């Protein structure tokens, strides 16, 4: 992952939208995030139809009725993506039976390389609960837009490339609407505690 000013855009958009109509809970400070979204509406997320790591079609409607913890990244990511997925997995492990109310979802920002088979092998390291999603580049671009995700290909030596991208975990409610969001700096125990409050 590359850190650029553009990668901060989703945070700024979310903060602006929050300031425009959401309620902040000053008393609920979460390390790695600060204030967390506790009520109100924000236009994040939307309908999509992608393919999971087993090659099966998956639509956003498949997850209705359950909470989702959604993260956008890519399997060739050298640092923040595996670290964040590990935090998600550890947080869910700390939630006991409540973890069954949340589906952890990893959506690739690199559909050219992240085939279903690649996603399946990659996500196996984080446990069986994860749903990995990929699709055609235009499908992924649309989902990125819906979730206000920044992702841009960055050329590297030897013809390879990395991805500069925002790093946000989105907690989506059973109705598919945003409940809260977290950055990669949050610790598993803090994430687990806040998730338990919100679900």
Language-model features: where?
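Short, small/polar residue-rich loop motifs at catalytic or cofactor-binding pockets
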Residues: 43-45, 67, 164-166
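Thiol/disulfide oxidoreductase modules built on the thioredoxin-like
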Residues: 139-194
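Hydrophobic beta-strand anchors of alpha/beta hydrolase catalytic cores
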Residues: 69-70, 104, 169
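Short active-site neighborhood of thiol/selenol oxidoreductases, capturing the structured segment around
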Residues: 61-84, 88
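Structural microenvironment flanking redox-active thiols in thiol-disulfide oxidoreductases
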Residues: 83-143
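N-terminal targeting signals for export/organelle localization
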Residues: 1-47
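A short beta-strand-turn-helix
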Residues: 48-68, 92-95
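Short, hydrophobic alpha-helical segments
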Residues: 195-199
């Amino acid at each position: 992952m590359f850190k650029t000013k553009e990668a901060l855009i989703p945070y700024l958009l979310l903060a602006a939208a929050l300031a425009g109509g959401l309620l902040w809970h000053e008393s609920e400070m979460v390390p790695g995030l600060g204030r967390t979204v506790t009520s109100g509406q924000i236009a994040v997320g939307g309908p999509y139809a992608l393919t999971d790591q087993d090659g099966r079609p998956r639509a956003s409607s498949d997850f209705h009725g359950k909470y989702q913890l959604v993260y956008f990244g890519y399997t060739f990511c050298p640092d923040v993506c595996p670290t964040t997925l590990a935090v998600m997995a550890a947080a869910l492990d700390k939630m006991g039976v409540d973890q069954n109310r949340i589906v952890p979802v990893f959506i690739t920002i690199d559909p050219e390389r992240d085939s279903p088979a690649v996603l399946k092998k990659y996500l196996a390291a984080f446990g069986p609960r994860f749903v990995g999603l990929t699709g055609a580049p235009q499908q992924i671009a649309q989902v990125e837009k819906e979730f206000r995700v920044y992702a841009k290909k960055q050329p590297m030596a030897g013809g390879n490339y990395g991805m500069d991208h925002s790093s946000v975990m989105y907690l989506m409610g059973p109705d598919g609407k945003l409940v809260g969001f977290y950055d990669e700096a949050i610790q598993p125990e803090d994430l687990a505690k806040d998730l338990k409050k919100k679900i």
